[in-house]
Amino acid sequence: TDCLVLIGSHLGENMHNGQVQEVSTAIERNATIITVDPRLSTIASKSKYWLPIKPATDLALLLSWIHVLIYEDIYDKKYIEQYAIGFEQLKDHVKNMTPEWAYGISTIQPDVIRKTAREMANASPSVIVHPGRHVAWYGDDSQRERAIAILNALLGSWGKRGGFYFKEAVKVPSYPHPKYPHPHWSWKDNLDGKYPLSAMGITTELLKASIPEFDYKHQIKAWIVAGTNFPLTIPNKELFQLAAESVDFIAVVDTMPMDITGYADVILPECTYLERYDTIRSAPHREPNIALRMPAVEPKWESKPSWWIAKQLGERLGLGSYFDYDDFSEVLDWQLKQMGTSLDEMQKIGIKIFPRKSGPLYLGDGEEYSFNTNSGKIELY
């Protein structure tokens, strides 16, 4: 890409090594980096533009960028005409959302908003406005993500070289475990239709279900907490504290002492990713691929891999028949053999690349394409 916009992302301070390497390459060839972050993060310090935005006001900035692209007539007209609908409604919607309007909300100067919008337009379609990771912390974050998607559409980025390529993943076959019984209830049963679009458990609702005063249909009496540090990840500390005091029992699975382990009745020490096998990695990418995470050294002291912890608990709860293997490597070897490889081969090569089956990475000039929407178009409004 020639222009990368990071809003809700702090590459360089997390474990996404592949992305960091690619961003480093982009910096070396003088790609423009625009970083929106209240603090001077690592990537902000490497950026051409750092926009120290007021927290929780991203949406105002995004809408003003959209306004500039449309009303300065610097969006990708040809792309929008072919692949999008709802442009006139969008144009009317953002009419008054000027950089001056956004400045009063976001504290970003109007001239900086205009300058950065023009940088994006100049790089179009080789521009990416990164959607961020784990960004749903505020009430309007779904709309925030929509605004980012709309911005990328106006820049002609979807399906274009230097923008967003069409990704593809390899399907990993499921190991033939015995069929699990259906749970008597799930977290959704407590919500009475709230949050219908949520596909995963809503942590704050699980905490509320642990507190008798909320009078939820299904009360939670115990927690097994794995891979999360509630005291630092739940914005409402008071809610967490009350929930932790309300449950009868807390078990924590973690690789090291954390804030949450101080609340545990029992701690089950998990070994680190360098000491265990994990499930086969198959993520959407340019080239479909699978990756094997395997142990480099034996686990230290009493720590164990998560599969071992789950299997031991299952056996003690009378559920041992659902863990019909002695070692998780048996599961991995079976799955890999269905995919034309084996655990032995993957231990040697680490990553295996497969041929694409879904077509080219990018749209050709003027190529017909149907997006995964009701209309088959990018729906701007």
PLM features per residue range, with description:
Residues 1-169, 190-296, 300-369, 376:
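Cofactor-pocket helix-loop regions in the catalytic cores of large enzyme subunits
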Residues 173, 178-186:
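Surface-exposed loop and adjacent secondary-structure segments within mature catalytic domains
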Residues 375-381:
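Short, intrinsically disordered, charge-balanced linker/junction segments flanking boundaries
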